[in-house]
Amino acid sequence: MPRYMLLLYAPEASAGEEAEREAEMPLWLDLTQSLKDAGLLVATDRLRSVDVATTVRVRDGTTEVVDGPFAVTKEFLGGYYVLECADLDEALAQAARMPLARYGSVEVRPVVDFEEVGPNA
């Protein structure tokens, strides 16, 4: 079955909004359990704040390490799900169930299966 990565992007939260997001944790736990029960969940994790991110670039043999994300953006990558879905339509339907879709965005990308396409995909 094809795999899809759901990348969860959220705007930076104010103190009040952060409390609201923490209050929705039971929704996330229920969603994750339902994905497990349906046999769709491959992996999921929440990422720490961009405040502790580090970006590494190598240019002309020189390694550059910079605190923070690669690009300044209004939304940050806060977590991900990897799901096994029958097709893109099912993956999109699951993305729409994410509580974050109401105030952020969920990017859905097919995952390359190297066993099917080989190492040159």
Q: Model-derived features: where do they sit?
A:
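Conserved, structured core segments of small domains
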Residues: 1-121
